[in-house]
């Protein structure tokens, strides 16, 4: 006889209960552990590992017996084996619960599990339509975004399939333009712009494609060569209201109103704007004059004007008319900048940079030293080096400790340097006299005129102040003379060199020949030498000046030139083409002059 699963479980539970009751009766009540006491109080018996193993063995034996009985009865054992195996795993995991003997609880748990499974299935079924709904919502959002973008494009005036093309060769035709952009797509329209003056092609065209993709392909031809020109391709922007001009946003710069200055600047005027149009705009204001900005050379209008009003009330009314349309263009109206006079010496302003005089400003703070060179002051180098910027005014002089000048331009330092230079000049240079004109030259027995010229550094001192050779700057004072090796003068003003040249020139005086009367200058300057015994000094006589040259002594002395009289260094190095000797030119050769005489 085949037993059902419920009956098998009931039988097994009865056997377990009997075995438990027998084991409890056999155990000593005194040796009961704490766990057993707790189990008895909670009515939940707990089995040890050994008892669990024994129960498992008994369960296995009983199952084997049941199977044998089923086979003997001719029942199908395959189905029961699979069911028993599945159930056995559950029984092993829930052995403790089975021992409780609560059949009702397990029967209640099964329908709850089934309910939970049904709920899960319902949730899954409900999730799928939600996902579908979410997908539909996302698609709707995307469609809305695309619509918004297209609306924005239309509002901005961007036409996706129309392009602006510039830089087209002037001799190109519409067919040539179509053939050039044929690879991009189907061209619907080509609008070529012509010049209004002569009706010739201006090199600009608007091309409309069939699709937006064709326009995108054509944008790749930007900066491409077409003939001898390069193309400029941009997206076409459509103006929503072409009749009304677009107002330009102002840059934000607006000069402030100045009391008593009622001039207004008007910019962004059309080229055909006249004075009548401006007066019509300011009809509510009292206008004194209107000046249109024009090119001085061509007289063409430059697109701006200045209007002078009678009072500040008219200026305030005029400023409110900013961005009003005149001749199709919105004009800019603001206060004009006030012109500053040239005498306004305000440092730090760019408008007065040309009229700012540094000498007048800093003359009292940093006076020119008494012994400063006249050439430095006249050229403006003194003020350029001493008072160059605000940094110089903040600096302190290392020599005197005062502000306003550098140590290189310190008056005390310059005065000391000039005193030292003057003392050296008193020892090393010659007490000379200013150059004098001499037209009556003494004649020799051979009726020849002589030109006596003596070189002294004192002549150079009279050439507009201190010269570079006698009383130069700090560089001259620090240099050494190449002739004598001493400091304080250059080799061109060395006393020893000048003395030697006087001896060489004296030999030339004896070789000169009588010549015709010539206008020359004689500089008779006595030079001191190092020899204390030679108190008389030496004179240098030069007669190699050319006949047709007339020298203005006063101008030569003032300009510090004396090119014809004081050029011994070059003349001494040259050779005469007539006699082959050094020291004179062919024009002053004694042999040549003798032949001519």
Curated annotation (Swiss-Prot):
It is a peripheral membrane protein. A motif (Nuclear localization signal) lies at residues 112-119. Residues 43-53, 112-129 have a biased composition (Basic residues). GO terms for cellular component: cytoskeleton; extrinsic component of membrane; nucleus; phragmoplast; plasma membrane. Residues 20-29 have a biased composition (Polar residues). Keywords: Cell membrane, Cytoplasm, Cytoskeleton, Membrane, Metal-binding, Nucleus, Repeat, RNA-binding, Zinc, Zinc-finger. It holds the Pfam family RRM_1. Residues 18-136 are annotated as: Disordered. InterPro entries: Nucleotide-bd_a/b_plait_sf (IPR012677), PHIP1_RRM1 (IPR034361), PHIP1_RRM2 (IPR034362), RBD_domain_sf (IPR035979), RRM_dom (IPR000504), Znf_CCHC (IPR001878), Znf_CCHC_sf (IPR036875). It is found in: Nucleus; Cell membrane; Cytoplasm, Cytoskeleton, Phragmoplast. SUPFAM superfamilies: Retrovirus zinc finger-like domains, RNA-binding domain, RBD. Residues 30-40 have a biased composition (Low complexity). A zinc finger (CCHC-type) spans 397-411, 481-495, 576-591. Residues 161-238, 262-338 form the RRM domain. GO terms for biological process: cell plate formation involved in plant-type cell wall biogenesis; phragmoplast assembly. One of its GO terms (molecular function) is zinc ion binding. RNA-binding protein which mediates polarized mRNA (e.g. Ran2 transcripts mRNA) transport from the nucleus to the vicinity of the cell plate during cytokinesis and phragmoplast formation. Interacts with phragmoplastins (e.g. DRP1A, DRP1B, DRP1C, DRP1D and DRP1E) and with GTP-bound ARAC11/ROP1 as well as with Ran2 transcripts. This is Phragmoplastin interacting protein 1. It comes from Arabidopsis thaliana. The lineage of its organism: Eukaryota, Viridiplantae, Streptophyta, Embryophyta, Tracheophyta.
């Amino acid at each position: 006889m085949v037993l059902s699963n419920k009956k098998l479980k009931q039988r097994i539970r009865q056997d377990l209960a009997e075995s438990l009751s027998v084991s409890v009766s056999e155990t000593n009540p005194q040796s009961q552990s704490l766990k057993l006491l707790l189990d008895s109080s909670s009515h939940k018996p707990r089995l040890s590992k050994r008892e669990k193993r024994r129960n498992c063995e008994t369960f296995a034996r009983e199952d084997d017996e049941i199977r044998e009985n089923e086979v003997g009865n001719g029942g199908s054992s395959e189905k029961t084996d699979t069911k028993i195996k599945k159930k056995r795993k559950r029984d092993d995991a829930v052995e403790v619960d089975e021992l409780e003997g609560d059949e009702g609880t397990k029967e209640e748990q099964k329908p709850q599990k089934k309910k939970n499974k049904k709920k899960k299935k319902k949730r899954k079924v409900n999730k799928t339509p939600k996902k579908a709904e979410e997908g539909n919502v996302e698609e709707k959002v995307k469609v809305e975004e695309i619509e918004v973008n297209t609306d924005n494009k239309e509002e901005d005036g961007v036409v996706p399939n129309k392009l602006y093309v510039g830089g087209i060769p002037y001799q190109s035709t519409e067919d040539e333009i179509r053939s050039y952009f044929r690879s991009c797509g189907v061209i619907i329209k080509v609008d070529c712009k012509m010049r209004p003056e002569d009706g010739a092609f201006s090199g600009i065209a608007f091309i409309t494609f069939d699709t937006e993709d064709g326009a995108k392909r054509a944008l790749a031809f930007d900066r491409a060569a077409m003939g001898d020109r390069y193309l400029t391709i941009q997206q076409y922007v459509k103006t929503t209201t072409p009749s009304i001009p677009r107002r330009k946003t102002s840059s934000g710069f607006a000069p402030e109103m100045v009391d008593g200055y009622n001039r207004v600047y008007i910019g962004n005027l059309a080229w055909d704007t006249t004075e009548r149009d401006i007066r019509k705009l300011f009809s509510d204001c009292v206008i004194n004059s209107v000046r249109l900005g024009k090119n001085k050379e061509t007289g063409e209008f430059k697109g701006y004007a200045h209007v002078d009003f009678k009072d500040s009330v008219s200026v305030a009314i005029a400023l409110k008319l900013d961005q009003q349309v005149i001749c199709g263009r919105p004009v800019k109206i603001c206060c004009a900048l006030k012109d500053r006079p040239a005498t306004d010496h305000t440092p730090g302003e760019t408008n007065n940079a040309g009229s700012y005089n540094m000498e007048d400003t800093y003359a009292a703070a940093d006076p020119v030293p008494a012994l400063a060179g006249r050439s430095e002051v006249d050229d403006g180098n003194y003020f350029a080096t001493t008072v160059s910027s605000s940094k110089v005014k903040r600096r302190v002089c290392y020599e005197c400790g005062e502000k306003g000048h550098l140590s290189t331009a310190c008056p005390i330092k310059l005065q000391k340097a000039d005193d030292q230079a003057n003392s050296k000049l008193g020892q090393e240079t010659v007490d000379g006299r200013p150059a004098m004109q001499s037209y009556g030259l003494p004649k020799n027995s051979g009726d020849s005129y002589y030109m006596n010229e003596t070189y002294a550094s004192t002549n150079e001192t009279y050439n507009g102040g201190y010269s570079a050779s006698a009383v130069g700057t700090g560089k001259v004072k620090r240099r050494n003379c190449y002739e004598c090796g001493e400091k304080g003068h250059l080799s061109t003003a060395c006393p020893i060199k000048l003395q030697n040249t006087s001896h060489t020139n004296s030999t030339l005086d004896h070789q000169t020949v009588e010549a015709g009367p010539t206008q020359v200058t004689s500089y008779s300057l006595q030079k001191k030498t190092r020899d204390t015994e030679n108190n008389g000094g030496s004179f240098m006589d030069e007669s190699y000046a050319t006949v047709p040259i007339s020298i203005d002594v006063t101008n030569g002395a003032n300009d510090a030139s004396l090119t014809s009289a004081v050029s011994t260094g070059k003349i001494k190095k040259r050779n005469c083409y007539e006699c082959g000797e050094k020291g004179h030119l062919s024009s002053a050769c004694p042999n040549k002059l003798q032949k001519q005489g």
